[in-house]
């Protein structure tokens, strides 16, 4: 029997997604929820309606849960706006992606001890929401985390983090139990960088 047949769920993805969006749809379906098919590109958001107004309308339609992905950090404002709808973050710009961070931590836990592992994170650290959420979650454990990547893609993290940084990938790989590779977030750059080095 469905657990929540009377609950309505809407996914609002203002940035592209495949795995996160479909995973949330499958989870809602498995729980017996009614899934509202919402396509941002064919919605009133495209005609200039604010996200706040869209959410307000959904709340009036008795939608219970909104999974939201947005380029900006807006979810806290929306939570303050309505008490009749629950929100889950599907990712906010380069700020956070809590569900992916949790999945990554559980993946490491499946193979390694979260308190005694050497973990290397390689790639575009300054623009990765996945990196931010993984680091936030791993702060609860006693693993040694090393960062690696081109300095022009890691400068903000290097300046603000107390984690070890090694620019040379071959050196950074030595002694690691886990390597987390992050893609370059081309969509977050205002101008194209030369990253073919």
Where are these regions (language model features)?
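Phosphate/diphosphate ligand-binding glycine-rich loop within oxidoreductases
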Residues: 2-109
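P-loop/Walker A phosphate-binding loop and immediately adjacent motor/lid segment at beta-alpha junctions
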Residues: 84-86, 118, 146-148, 193-197
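Glycine-rich phosphate/diphosphate-binding loop of Rossmann-like nucleotide-binding domains
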Residues: 14-26, 109-182, 187
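Charged helix-capping and loop-helix junction motifs
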Residues: 49-53, 163-164, 194-197
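Glycine/threonine-rich flexible loop motifs
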Residues: 183-197
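Short, flexible loop segments at the rims of nucleotide/cofactor-binding pockets, characterized by
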Residues: 42-46, 65, 123-125, 158-160, ...
């Amino acid at each position: 029997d469905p657990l929540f047949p009377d609950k309505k769920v809407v996914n609002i993805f203002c940035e592209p997604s495949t795995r996160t969006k479909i995973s949330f749809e499958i989870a809602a379906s498995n729980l017996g929820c009614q899934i509202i098919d919402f396509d941002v590109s064919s919605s009133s958001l495209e005609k200039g309606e604010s996200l706040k107004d869209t959410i307000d309308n959904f709340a009036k339609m008795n939608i219970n849960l909104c999974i939201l992905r947005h380029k900006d950090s807006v979810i806290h404002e929306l939570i303050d706006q309505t008490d009749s709808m629950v929100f889950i973050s599907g990712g906010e710009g380069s700020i956070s992606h809590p569900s992916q961070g949790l999945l990554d931590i559980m993946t490491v836990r499946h193979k390694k001890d979260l308190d005694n592992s050497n973990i290397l994170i390689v790639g575009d650290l300054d623009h990765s929401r996945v990196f931010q959420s993984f680091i936030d979650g791993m702060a609860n454990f006693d693993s040694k985390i090393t960062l690696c990547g081109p300095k022009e893609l890691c400068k903000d993290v290097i300046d603000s983090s107390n984690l070890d940084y090694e620019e040379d990938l071959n050196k950074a790989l030595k002694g690691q139990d886990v390597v987390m590779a992050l893609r370059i977030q081309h969509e977050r750059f205002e101008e194209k960088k030369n990253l073919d080095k």
